[in-house]
């Protein structure tokens, strides 16, 4: 999450991009123009490498720690135990963000931040996190298990895809849909006829 100061700096950049002098003047800009500008607005890069970096719509408009609505960074809140104890279902695809950006530059090595967050969640107690790792190669163009490819399965929308899914894909989708529905209803994804899904614990990662 951004700091309030960085969010304010980015807001000032956006006003300049809109060619307006104040928030009041910005409010007179037609909504369609605002939406278009929000997408084309160059991404902010405080590292000094230049403003025009990829994924601008994703990186420009993220929450900030403003001291009122959000009072601390999410990771810090987890570690300090400042959260409502609730069950969690979280996961990733094996090909998550493995394709380079539009300029072909490979992504730097990550620091396993999501695993650290899960560890912090488990250590805080009072909840049971269930974790999944989606590893199904998408048929059609050998794209692998790319970002969001699990959504077709969990929401049961395989028929809406152009990809040549087969019978076992639909079986997996049905099982995932049941897991997700059970979790939403009870906080536990397990149910009759489903392979047991064990919650993560402080002693190690389980999928």
Model-found features: residue ranges?
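Substrate-access "cap/lid" subdomains that shape
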Residues: 1-119
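Mobile gating loops/cap/lid regions near enzyme active sites that modulate substrate access
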Residues: 47, 119, 123-207
């Amino acid at each position: 999450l951004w700091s309030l100061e960085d969010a304010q700096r980015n807001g000032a950049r956006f006003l300049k991009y809109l060619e307006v002098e104040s928030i009041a003047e910005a409010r007179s800009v037609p909504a369609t123009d605002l939406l278009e500008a929000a997408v084309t607005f160059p991404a902010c890069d405080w590292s000094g490498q230049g403003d025009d970096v990829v994924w601008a719509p994703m990186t420009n408009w993220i929450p900030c720690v403003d001291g009122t609505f959000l009072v601390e960074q999410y990771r810090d809140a987890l570690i300090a135990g400042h959260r409502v104890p609730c069950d969690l279902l979280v996961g990733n695809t094996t090909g998550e963000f493995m394709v380079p950006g539009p300029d072909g530059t490979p992504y730097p090595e990550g620091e396993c931040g999501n695993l650290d967050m899960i560890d912090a969640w488990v250590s805080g107690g009072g909840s049971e996190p269930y974790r999944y790792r989606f590893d199904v190669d998408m048929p059609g163009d050998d794209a692998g298990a790319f970002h969001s490819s699990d959504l077709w399965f969990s929401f049961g929308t395989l028929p809406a895809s152009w990809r040549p899914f087969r019978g076992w894909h639909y079986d997996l989708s049905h099982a995932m849909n049941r897991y997700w529905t059970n979790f939403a209803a009870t906080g536990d994804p397990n149910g009759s006829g489903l392979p047991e899904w064990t919650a993560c614990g402080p002693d190690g990662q389980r999928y």
